[in-house]
Amino acid sequence: MAGRTYRRRFLLLGGVCLLLLLGSMLVGRYGLSAGKLLHMLWARLTGGAADWSVSDEKVVFAIRLPRIAAAALVGAALAVSGTAYQGMFRNPMVSPDILGASTGAGFGAALAILLGAGYFGISLSAFCFGLLAVAAAWLVSRLSRSDPTVALILAGMMISSLFSAGTSFIKLVADTQQQLPAITYWLMGSLSAIKAEDVRFLVLPVAVGLLPLFLLRWRMNLLTVGEEEAQSMGVRTGALRLVVILCATLLTAASVAVSGMIGWVGLVIPHFCRMLFGYDYRRLIPAAALFGAAFLLAVDDIARLVTTGELPLGILTAFVGAPLFLYLIITGGRRHEH
């Protein structure tokens, strides 16, 4: 019975995600009918004649499609990353930035903007510094003789603080006319400048990060029972933790490199997935990917609809995510009382 319920929920979530993918193609100031959109997509898939205007071609395939693909990939990546980190650390308050990937990426982007790099250079710098931040946290934690998990969290907090201070210093010395506004806007997160090249940049690291987590999701259940219990079952917990950290970091760094710093997705979505699909990571990982993609697609649609000048996604996810998280805290407390 429970298995049938979960299957229905997966089908519903997948259907919502598909509807949002198609519906998002219609959102924007440039008017486009659903029939025309479906005709264009079908013709492109089947190699049919392109009997539409140049404007339609540009809006659908050069502007909206890359943006929607990026929103789905970033949402899925951040949600799965948060789910993996929360399971590994056995802490529901953990977010994808726990080890400094987001702040490291933010520093890398700010540095690239300060040095006058182009759009791809900014993304590449953000990606590399995101990975560097987590690598530094991991190396520092290995030097500690205290509990490995606690040492890793503390090292991540320290590295994150250092990169945050570095970003603040860059903002202090940046040109106030061009560089400072560019840094500030990038740090707030947005998909408004996404191009097809960004999606191609994003696909590989997201795929490399998602695939091992998907294949090892049943082993991740064993991490939640504790270190000694997992080892007694024959699980090499050290190697498994390292793989989870590498994959989750890759997902976070790649997402932030393309979209900027978008918070709350990796913190809130795993909670909703546990409410709907339980604590089994065999269901949680794919559910988080679908839920995260749907959530960021919806938020990005709101960003395009609310004002003529788009709101940064980081602001909107905070406006939406914070009340939802507060609701989860209150209802969770009531469930424990009863």
Role assignments for model-derived ranges:
Residues 1-338:
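Alpha-helical transmembrane segments in inner-membrane proteins
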